[in-house]
């Protein structure tokens, strides 16, 4: 059993703990929160022995071998680095860090300390995403794709009311492309590799983060358009178009349904059964990396490439975070 700790006590942390336990590979051993009351409240639902209000104390503790980080984006890098330096394996929620420089430093730290660093981009681990990748030859010569994820944020009204929620605050390295737009970008890179170039546009809020945007990725023979928003909903599926037909994906982040629409024929449902908690697959992947002591793994290349193009997209749209090095602004 891999003894792990969690940083963050929100809904996504609970989902991860439940699925981590379901893999049969993990045991929750510690919880961190700035508030002991909050840590205790979270721990009441699990048999947890250790509660921490000090990150350094938890990082030094022999009670844990690994940590799951689900804190605000701007804290991901410093917390990841701290635990790697104390020889703990790290699974960090996406995005792994605020920019490419931080991701490079995190990967270097994992290598220096010979510990697994794994970015929690669940989509790449899903059975239906793997099916989607295997099904690409069905469409023949590819010409274009639309990867779409637009979802009205439950915190947007708070922003409109004059509050400053983390979701729309550049101090926390947040915004549309860093949150749900990430799924579109990372999925494209997981399917087709890095583009030749990108052209990005976005509508910025007064806070300085992007509310929504569009990115066109140039792959030479084909293009991929990313559409993302945190201030509006979309009912459109994502679509990959080729000369022999199209692949249609409902809710890209979870690949809820994958269909093949042959040119001139009826649509075929290719969807495979998936666990209701789609975090199960990334939890299993993290456990396997630890068991195999696979410090070097393909996920690191995907994390770096995604960070590289996230950084470039923000450079083009003018979204700047305090974490960015302003003497060499957003260089990719």
Segments from the language model and where they lie:
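N-terminal Rossmann-like dinucleotide-binding module
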Residues: 1-46
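Beta-loop-alpha module in the N-terminal Rossmann-like domain of NAD(P)-dependent dehydrogenases
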Residues: 46-109
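Hydrophobic residues in well-ordered beta-strands that form the structural core
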Residues: 52, 92, 117-119, 249
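C-terminal helix-rich "cap/oligomerization" subdomain common to oxidoreductases
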Residues: 66-68, 104, 285-332
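Rossmann-fold dehydrogenase core element
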Residues: 105-123, 141-144
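Predominantly a Rossmann-like dinucleotide-binding segment in NAD(P)-dependent oxidoreductases
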Residues: 124-195
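Contiguous beta-strand/loop segments that form the cofactor/metal-binding neighborhood of enzyme cores
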Residues: 184-255, 284-292, 329-332
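Active-site loop of classical SDR/Rossmann-like NAD(P)-dependent oxidoreductases
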Residues: 270-284
């Amino acid at each position: 059993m891999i003894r792990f700790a969690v940083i963050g006590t929100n809904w996504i942390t609970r989902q991860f703990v439940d699925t981590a336990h379901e893999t049969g590979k993990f045991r929750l051993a510690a919880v961190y929160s700035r508030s002991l009351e909050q840590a205790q409240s979270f721990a009441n639902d699990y048999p947890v022995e250790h509660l921490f209000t000090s990150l350094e104390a938890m990082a030094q503790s022999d009670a844990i071998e690994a940590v799951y980080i689900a804190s605000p984006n701007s804290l991901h890098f410093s917390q990841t680095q701290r635990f790697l330096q104390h020889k703990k394996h790290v699974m960090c929620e996406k995005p792994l860090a605020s920019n490419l420089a931080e991701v490079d430093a995190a990967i270097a730290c994992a290598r220096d300390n010979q510990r697994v660093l794994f970015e929690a981009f669940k989509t790449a681990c899903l059975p239906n995403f793997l099916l989607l990748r295997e099904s690409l030859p069905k469409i023949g010569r590819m010409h274009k794709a639309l990867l779409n994820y637009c979802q009205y944020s439950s915190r947007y009204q708070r922003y409109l009311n004059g509050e400053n929620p983390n979701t729309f605050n550049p101090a926390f390295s947040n915004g549309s492309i860093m949150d749900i737009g990430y799924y579109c970008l990372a999925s494209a890179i997981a399917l087709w590799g890095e583009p030749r170039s990108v052209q990005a546009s976005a509508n910025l809020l007064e806070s300085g983060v992007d509310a929504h945007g569009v990115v066109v990725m140039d792959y030479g023979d084909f293009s991929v358009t990313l559409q993302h928003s945190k201030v509006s909903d979309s009912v459109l599926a994502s679509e990959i178009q080729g000369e022999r037909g199209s692949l249609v994906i409902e809710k890209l982040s979870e690949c809820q349904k994958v269909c093949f629409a042959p040119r001139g024929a009826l649509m075929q449902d290719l969807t495979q059964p998936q666990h209701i908690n789609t975090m199960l697959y990334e939890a299993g992947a993290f456990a396997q990396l630890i068991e195999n002591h696979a410090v070097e793994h393909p996920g690191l290349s995907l994390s770096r490439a995604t960070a590289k193009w996230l950084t470039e997209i923000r450079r083009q749209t003018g979204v700047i975070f305090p974490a960015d090095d302003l003497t060499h602004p957003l260089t990719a």
